[in-house]
Every structure is written in C-alpha cells, then in structure tokens.
C-alpha cells in the first residue's frame, strides 16, 4: 500500500512539473521570433526585422486615446494639451476631430 501511494505521488509530481515547464516556456515563446516574416505580421510593418529572436519594428506606432469629440480644421482649433495625459498632445486628425495622441 505504501509503494502504491509513493508511486501515485511521484507520477503526480512529475505531471505537475511537466505542466508548469510547458506553461513557462510557452509564454516565453510567444514573445520571440524566428524570421523577419513573424515580425512583419506582429508589427504590421514591412520593414520589421527579427534580431536575436526579438522583433524590432522600424516605424513608431501612434497610440490614440478616446476623448470627447471636439471638431477642428487645424491643430490650433484643439484645446490645450495639458488636458491630455502625460506625453500626449492634442492633434486634429483627418476626420476633423481633436484627439490626444502620443508619437
């Protein structure tokens, strides 16, 4: 009976160890790249490169934040940028709306 309990415990610990091992390396594998094509798809940028297993996007991506709609024709029509979060500023986008953006 003791041998059976010990065998079941060893199998359970082995199963748990394998599960954790696969989960840890599965998370890391998602952040890595093998070819430039992987990076082109991730960055949505034809100039992206895979360097030492890490994607490097050639162009900067613009982050936008949703704000209340303010109509504009130029950036001067938008309110002061101090109303935007840090490192953001107001810009008049093509659709004629002021939006806080970060470049």
Curated annotation (Swiss-Prot):
The family this protein is said to belong to: Belongs to the DEFL family.
Lineage: Eukaryota, Viridiplantae, Streptophyta, Embryophyta, Tracheophyta
Localization per record: Secreted
UniProt key word Transport: no
Any single GO CC term annotated in Swiss-Prot or TrEMBL for this entry: extracellular region
Gene Ontology biological process terms in this record: defense response to fungus; killing of cells of another organism
Residues spanning the signal sequence: 1-29
Primary localisation category: secreted
Protein known as: Defensin-like protein 290
Disulfide bonds: 33-50, 39-55, 43-57, 72-92, 78-98, 84-100
Keyword set, alphabetical order: Antimicrobial, Disulfide bond, Fungicide, Plant defense, Secreted, Signal
